[in-house]
């Protein structure tokens, strides 16, 4: 009998489930499959940009996922004539000189139309469209500046996917040209820096636009700032590689690493021109690169706070420019929230909180003179937006010009 009871107890013990308490609870983040940041970015863009751009989104989408097209910004401090000859040998063309040719043709046609309409007694249609006198003057001055700019940037024709070789050093040790998204020059051209101007580049690194500002040879003084010390170091390297020491003395170029939002208090009403090329979602980078991707889960809050940061930086830029001066705001994002909405919000904040009144400027003339190089979106409330396209895979690049009213 005792043996039978022992046998039954062993069978019961063997069949019972025993519960074991683990030291740590498993986290969902370690058990669920990890989604790449680039995939998260694509999902986000599909959800938002498909509504923003409608039927245009599939074309933009495939262009963003395809290799970007580059332009070659010629270094005016190098042996320029030799560089122009070498780049022309690649069957590349300077898109700025092409735009200057378009401006000349439009001006000739406009003069002919004006003469004919004055003879027939009809109203004249100006090259810059149906605008009031102040807007006509501003647009005419901008076109005149485009006609006389010293910037030169080569690009391959539409549909040509050739790539420029890496730049070589000249006899002075300076690199001959700088490879960059050609659309990144549009904010610099829109800024319209004139001879003797003091200029602030509020978010300067990695340095392409800063270098372009110096290539205009119009900056009497250039302040280049970026919050990141590592990115500021890269900016230093870029300028050392392209600009002679005599052109980047502390009296001509000052590189700082400060919070750009404080610039409005530190140097209010100081500069003739201010470029505010803000941190953004960098749409193309977010789709193609995992490293330093703003769609990483640990950067979710940072991404959500971007429009606020952008508006604060733009307000600082508007305060730093003197009355009568101009500010250009730019991003490399397609997002309305980071583009038009930020501009509109910053204009309101500058007026209500600081008594700084500004007026957005019409840049529609850029669509006309650069239409052979870039694809522009027609639906912006303010500013202009370059859309990526497979035949001309530049951008995205949004830029908006603001005039501080005296």
UniProtKB/Swiss-Prot annotation:
Catalyzes what? a cytidine in rRNA + S-adenosyl-L-methionine = a 5-methylcytidine in rRNA + S-adenosyl-L-homocysteine + H(+); a cytidine in mRNA + S-adenosyl-L-methionine = a 5-methylcytidine in mRNA + S-adenosyl-L-homocysteine + H(+)
Q: Which GO terms describe its biological process?
A: mitochondrial RNA catabolic process; RNA methylation; rRNA processing
GO molecular function per UniProt? mRNA (cytidine-5-)-methyltransferase activity; RNA binding
UniProt-listed Enzyme Commission number(s): 2.1.1.-
Give the UniProt entry's GO cellular component terms: mitochondrial matrix
Q: Where does S-adenosyl-L-methionine bind?
A: 207-209, 226, 231, 259-260, 277
What Pfam families does this protein map onto?
A: Methyltr_RsmB-F (PF01189)
Q: Where are the transmembrane segments?
A: none
Q: Which UniProt keywords apply?
A: Methyltransferase, Mitochondrion, RNA-binding, rRNA processing, S-adenosyl-L-methionine, Transferase, Transit peptide
Similarity remark: Belongs to the class I-like SAM-binding methyltransferase superfamily. RsmB/NOP family.
**What does this protein's UniProt record list under function?**
Involved in mitochondrial ribosome large subunit biogenesis. Mitochondrial RNA cytosine C(5)-methyltransferase that methylates cytosine to 5-methylcytosine (m5C) in various RNAs, such as rRNAs, mRNAs and some long non-coding RNAs (lncRNAs). Involved in mitochondrial ribosome small subunit (SSU) maturation by catalyzing methylation of mitochondrial 12S rRNA.
Q: What is this protein called?
A: 5-cytosine rRNA methyltransferase NSUN4
Query: What taxonomic lineage is listed for the species of origin?
Result: Eukaryota, Metazoa, Chordata, Craniata, Vertebrata
> Which gene specifies this protein's sequence?
nsun4
